[in-house]
Amino acid sequence: MAQVINTNSLSLLTQNNLNKSQSSLSSAIERLSSGLRINSAKDDAAGQAIANRFTSNIKGLTQASRNANDGISIAQTTEGALNEINNNLQRVRELSVQATNGTNSDSDLKSIQDEIQQRLEEIDRVSNQTQFNGVKVLSQDNQMKIQVGANDGETITIDLQKIDVKSLGLDGFNVNGPKEATVGDLKSSFKNVTGYDTYAAGADKYRVDINSGAVVTDAVAPDKVYVNAANGQLTTDDAENNTAVDLFKTTKSAAGTAEAKAIAGAIKGGKEGDTFDYKGVTFTIDTKTGDDGNGKVSTTINGEKVTLTVADIAIGAADVNAATLQSSKNVYTSVVNGQFTFDDKTKSESAKLSDLEANNAVKGESKITVNGAEYTANATGDKITLAGKTMFIDKTASGVSTLINEDAAAAKKSTANPLASIDSALSKVDAVRSSLGAIQNRFDSAITNLGNTVTNLNSARSRIEDADYATEVSNMSKAQILQQAGTSVLAQANQVPQNVLSLLR
């Protein structure tokens, strides 16, 4: 090896090795002080890129876990509000069951409806005011996406539905609305109600007064209806003519009638005080005028004495063919029982509803007048109309009954099948609550999975970028020793050119 002064190759070699050990020592100290194996891309370019992607995933998944917890909070808030809505619906159902009981008075129903209305208004208030972080969760249909992953599209959707009185089908829910008026309602709810029912017996039509029961013909100028005394048929005649008995007439008979000759013959052949029978009647000879047949006979009818006078038979006449007969009273045969009567007519009884029914009369519609207005009722009396519109009975604020038509009643009439309506509303609330409960369980599962993923990613990133202290301490010790050795050797290498000077002495 040449002895030179200008170039100290040993020193240069030693310096180079010393720089290497210095770099190794610097790297080891940096890793030990930071705890990271990769402090910059130069430490491990590929590893740094991989670790950075892991960091992005870890941070994204950690935030996603917080998002999922927010999703649980939203679901819990919504479900809590729905629970209160459910409680109100249950109370409304309880009140509706009470309202359907027929023992309730009008004031009872009003009190029940007042509480139902308050409960329904509370449902709307809960719907409008329940919110999470400024978002109203029940006031409208909405789909809320919760980011539960570190990448696009990794979401879980919470289906929020509008839940209020209208969406539950309970808008206008009423258990104390107007009810269809009946004839019975009109009679019991109003004063001075008048009118009539119509009946038809064949081609004949009749009216029956709803208050007095009087029967008249169904006409513009109605006639009173009677029951015929002879045959029980309906008639407008108030009496039936009885049959006059020829034997008893106050007008003198024609000469030689059978009755006159028979009575004259009895007088002629008898004496005063004798009795005889004729046509089922027993007569007594009161007066005998001569022996020609003239005279008077009497009998008792219905407790009254009736005298028959025979006259106009000539004195010494050979027969009684010229006899005439005259009664002190007119006597008739009753058309009802065939008995003798002094009445020329038998009075017919006024017809009643039972008489119409006995004649197979069929009931038709009715005309009912309330407060000056005439209403029409159907044959069964359970439907009242005016100008073709069904009438309902309603109550004013002071509790006074009033009649309104179907148009006015539509907005306030009682809900048909109220219990079924509430059950439907409860089912809808239950369905939404079930959905929210399921989504909470899903979020719990997502949070658990995110936690596992973050743990595994942290472990993977640690293996790439975290410093292995055992290795790095060993590297630092090695570098320190090399530094010490290099420094010492460099000092000796720097002394080598001094040896060349010895050649110059």
From Swiss-Prot:
Q: Name one GO molecular function term.
A: structural molecule activity
* Record localization: Secreted; Bacterial flagellum
Query: Matching Gene3D superfamilies, A to Z?
Result: 6.10.280.190, f41 fragment of flagellin, C-terminal domain, f41 fragment of flagellin, middle domain, f41 fragment of flagellin, N-terminal domain, Flagellar export chaperone, C-terminal domain
Pfam families recorded:
Flagellin_C, Flagellin_N, FliC-like_3rd
Alphabetized InterPro entries for the sequence: Flagellin, Flagellin_C, Flagellin_C_sub2, Flagellin_N
Q: Which UniProt keywords apply?
A: Bacterial flagellum, Secreted
Matching SUPFAM superfamilies:
Phase 1 flagellin (SSF64518)
Its annotated function is as follows:
Flagellin is the subunit protein which polymerizes to form the filaments of bacterial flagella.
The miscellaneous remark of the record is:
Individual Salmonella serotypes usually alternate between the production of 2 antigenic forms of flagella, termed phase 1 and phase 2, each specified by separate structural genes.
Show the PANTHER family listed in the entry: FLAGELLIN
Full protein name: Phase 1 flagellin
Q: Which organism is it from?
A: Salmonella naestved
